[in-house]
């Protein structure tokens, strides 16, 4: 099956719009845009103007989608060897590399121009740096070079709250950086839980994820330690007076559940514990930012 998928990379049919949509990783981009919206809202006591909100989300969304499409393009041969990614458009031959390149470049340029012209140059360049960080630095180099790939490369994926903040303020301020640090610290336990679940896939594709290079048990220890660190970082918005009791109670519950998953994965795992932790981590981040928003306006 994998050899057929590999051969299909050069055999394309008429692309369906769903193939292009899949290139953009819409669920990932939706989560990124949620964090960007929260960044915007926390930057002001007033409601965010639609004149800022619409072009900012359009530009950030398009450039995030472009980065995702480049990731599909660069990783197409790796994806053909992994069960989780085998059905993506490029391994299946639904799209050609040339079409994906054109698509990514087009939406990336439109996104940058939108931010530069209708939001502000600072946000445009920061979003561009984030796109390059993920699509080039992480995907092309770090992912293939070091088991710390997602630790270093995670900074690019953590940028959207800052991008939302600068869309409103045109400044980089400490609260926005703290929001970035929450996602940056969240990223390793999120991805390493998936890597533990899919360790054989990554080994087959020769991707040096931590479970492949250092073993499952070492990775579980790192996941637990990073989850403890995440718990501390998540408390910082309350400790510095950025949020109130609604956030403290909500994030404490989320952190307790996340820590419970990390503990179980380390000391009494079942077959599905790693994947369940990965799945919950997405809810953790999404709900954390929703709680930030509720706390800000209530």
From Swiss-Prot:
<feature type="transmembrane region" description="Helical">
    <location>
        <begin position="149"/>
        <end position="169"/>
    </location>
</feature>
<keyword id="KW-0808">Transferase</keyword>
<comment type="similarity">
    <text>Belongs to the UbiA prenyltransferase family. Protoheme IX farnesyltransferase subfamily.</text>
</comment>
<feature type="transmembrane region" description="Helical">
    <location>
        <begin position="121"/>
        <end position="138"/>
    </location>
</feature>
<feature type="transmembrane region" description="Helical">
    <location>
        <begin position="95"/>
        <end position="117"/>
    </location>
</feature>
<keyword id="KW-1003">Cell membrane</keyword>
<protein>
    <recommendedName>
        <fullName>Protoheme IX farnesyltransferase</fullName>
        <ecNumber>2.5.1.141</ecNumber>
    </recommendedName>
</protein>
<feature type="transmembrane region" description="Helical">
    <location>
        <begin position="274"/>
        <end position="294"/>
    </location>
</feature>
<keyword id="KW-0350">Heme biosynthesis</keyword>
<feature type="transmembrane region" description="Helical">
    <location>
        <begin position="222"/>
        <end position="242"/>
    </location>
</feature>
<dbReference type="InterPro" id="IPR044878">
    <property type="entry name" value="UbiA_sf"/>
</dbReference>
<keyword id="KW-0812">Transmembrane</keyword>
<feature type="transmembrane region" description="Helical">
    <location>
        <begin position="243"/>
        <end position="263"/>
    </location>
</feature>
<dbReference type="Pfam" id="PF01040">
    <property type="entry name" value="UbiA"/>
</dbReference>
<feature type="transmembrane region" description="Helical">
    <location>
        <begin position="28"/>
        <end position="48"/>
    </location>
</feature>
<comment type="pathway">
    <text>Porphyrin-containing compound metabolism; heme O biosynthesis; heme O from protoheme: step 1/1.</text>
</comment>
<dbReference type="InterPro" id="IPR030470">
    <property type="entry name" value="UbiA_prenylTrfase_CS"/>
</dbReference>
<keyword id="KW-0472">Membrane</keyword>
<dbReference type="GO" id="GO:0005886">
    <property type="term" value="C:plasma membrane"/>
</dbReference>
<dbReference type="GO" id="GO:0008495">
    <property type="term" value="F:protoheme IX farnesyltransferase activity"/>
</dbReference>
<keyword id="KW-1133">Transmembrane helix</keyword>
<feature type="transmembrane region" description="Helical">
    <location>
        <begin position="50"/>
        <end position="70"/>
    </location>
</feature>
<feature type="transmembrane region" description="Helical">
    <location>
        <begin position="176"/>
        <end position="196"/>
    </location>
</feature>
<dbReference type="InterPro" id="IPR006369">
    <property type="entry name" value="Protohaem_IX_farnesylTrfase"/>
</dbReference>
<dbReference type="InterPro" id="IPR000537">
    <property type="entry name" value="UbiA_prenyltransferase"/>
</dbReference>
<comment type="function">
    <text>Converts heme B (protoheme IX) to heme O by substitution of the vinyl group on carbon 2 of heme B porphyrin ring with a hydroxyethyl farnesyl side group.</text>
</comment>
<keyword id="KW-0997">Cell inner membrane</keyword>
<dbReference type="GO" id="GO:0048034">
    <property type="term" value="P:heme O biosynthetic process"/>
</dbReference>
């Amino acid at each position: 099956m994998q050899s057929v998928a590999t051969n299909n990379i050069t055999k394309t049919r008429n692309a369906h719009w769903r193939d292009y949509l899949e290139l953009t990783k819409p669920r990932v981009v939706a989560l990124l845009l949620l964090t960007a919206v929260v960044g915007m809202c926390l930057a002001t006591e007033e409601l965010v103007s639609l004149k800022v909100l619409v072009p900012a989300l359009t530009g950030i969304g398009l450039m995030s989608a472009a980065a995702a499409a480049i990731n599909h393009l660069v990783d197409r041969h790796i994806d053909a060897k992994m069960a989780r990614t085998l059905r993506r458009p490029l391994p299946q031959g639904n799209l050609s590399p040339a079409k994906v390149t054109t698509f990514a470049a087009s939406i990336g340029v439109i996104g940058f121009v939108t931010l530069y012209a209708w939001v502000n140059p600072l946000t445009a360049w920061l979003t561009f740096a984030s796109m390059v960080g993920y699509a080039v630095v992480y995907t092309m180099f770090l992912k293939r070079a070091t088991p710390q790939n997602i630790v270093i490369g995670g900074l690019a994926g953590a940028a959207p709250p800052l991008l939302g903040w600068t869309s409103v303020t045109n400044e980089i301020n400490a609260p926005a950086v703290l929001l970035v640090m929450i996602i940056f610290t969240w990223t390793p336990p999120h991805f390493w839980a998936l890597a533990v679940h899919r360790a054989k896939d990554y080994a087959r594709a020769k991707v040096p994820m931590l479970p492949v290079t250092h073993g499952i048990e070492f990775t579980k220890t790192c996941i637990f330690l990073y989850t403890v660190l995440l718990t501390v970082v998540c408390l910082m918005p309350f400790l510095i007076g950025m949020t109130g009791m609604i956030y403290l109670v909500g994030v404490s519950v989320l952190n307790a559940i996340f820590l419970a998953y990390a503990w179980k994965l380390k000391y009494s795992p079942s077959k599905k514990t790693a994947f369940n932790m990965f799945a919950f981590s997405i809810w953790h981040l999404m709900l954390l930012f929703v709680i930030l928003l509720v706390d800000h306006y209530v």
